[in-house]
């Protein structure tokens, strides 16, 4: 555990504010929920005395924080290989392989990206979700952003909420799309199948943009940008326009084959067992320096192999 001692004087401009509100402004490196916990436990005091979170301030009081920064998560470190695209004192960019679960959960407390991060970067144990700013599904490959400090995590989470972080994907879709477009359709839990998401009335706002990169006889390679970040958003939205991702076990349906497909193409499509989706680019402003950053990731080997088969089939059919 890390010991923390901070002493601050409440500035006059915060007069009239609640203690918890002022603490969030004066100690932005800590989350509001954590500050509230410390106030309730008497670790964040006002004028040397415990106080309630709703106490109104007059200005000029002394705030004192004396506590231990306990681990935010109880996940065991594990020596799982990581591909680190970028590393500095504020953030990491990880290239996640297919099949790696991001967050521990029921049935998979080990073998996740969080376990790997905690082994290589033990200090992340003090951060919510080990610093992860967003997530990818288990069988989606590509770039993930991780904060290394609580201040960076809060800044990056706010940037994500304001849509200042640009996330770009490539996907192999079923069907032959004629052009790009934008999908604006709310996403929520499927009304009957609770493990699925769907486009539903009253769902959360969700917007996706896509453009065609390459067409094949019965499939399309698309570049996709998220404007929002709902669960399974790309998979749900592309299925909604009848262009589900190849291999998607939940939203994909049966493989679509062109007329007279080669045995190689039939085998490749029927054997592709995960959604054909890869996070290829990540663009953001550095949380401390403000520098514009952009990171790229090459398509995963299984996607490259499938594209080779699709191209060969299209060429042979000319």
Predicted regions located by residue number:
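RNA pseudouridine synthases
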Residues: 1-318
